[in-house]
Every structure is written in C-alpha cells, then in structure tokens.
Amino acid sequence: MAYLDWLDRTLQAKLAEKPVGEPVALRFSLAATEDHGLLIPALARALSLASAWLGSRIERLYAMGSLHDGSVSVLAEPAGGQTAFVSSELSRGAIAVRLLLIGNHGTLIWEDSPGADGLKVDFRIEGRSEDQWLREALERSLESGDSEEVRRG
C-alpha cells in the first residue's frame, strides 16, 4: 500500500473517533525526494486528502511558489468554511510528512519521516479522479498569480 493511502486510512479511522471535534483548519506539508513525482501531482493528492480529512470539498485555492525552485504552497478554501494550507517541496534529504489538524475541541499533530528507519517505503503519488480538477486549478493559480475556483466537470 502506498504511504499516502495508508496515512489517509489511518487518519480517517482516528477522525471517526472525533478526537478534535469538528475539523476547522489543516496544515499539511510533504517533503519528498525528487524521484517520487512532481510537485503538482503531489499537491493535488495532498489537497484531495485535506478535503477528505476536513469533510468538505475544496472550492477555491491560491498557489504560490515555484516549480523551478521545487517548493509550492497552497491556501485552500473548502466549501464548509474551513481553511487548509498545504505545501510540497522537493528534498535532497529524507521524506518528511507533517500534519496539524485543528478542530473545535482540540488538535491532532502527525510528524513522520517514512523510510528514515531504513525500511523501504512506497511513496508513490497516485492520482485520483478528484485530483485532476485540483491539479488544473493549481496550474491556473500558479500561472495567474491569483486564487482560482476548482472547476469540476
């Protein structure tokens, strides 16, 4: 199983217990080595996960940074009024995953360096159907320098 699929399954199970109440904000950061995929697909997948964890589809986003420099951050606005800040960067070091989920009754923090223990980790970035709409909005926002609506179908 790919790491991000495992993380999604693990976090969904934890969130079902309502440990933070209703999620209201999310900070999600991925630092992956260059051989694991491109920034835009990684960001689209991360935004799709953020949407699932917040329980609300992302309607609008603003991307900033540079593909050339290997670092892009996104401020996203889900339909439910929550806030998501997602970033992805290429790293010459180890893979790093950081997550801060803020709810109306607490916070959840997740930090991991998959593979740092020497075990092989499947860190493929596999796209989902929802990712395509997010990917297109990311590309438009980076090109325009402005926020963009996520246009579905």
Question: What name fits each language-model region?
Answer:
Residues L4-D8, L43-L47, A94, D131-R135:
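A structural signal for well-ordered alpha-helical scaffolds and beta->alpha junctions
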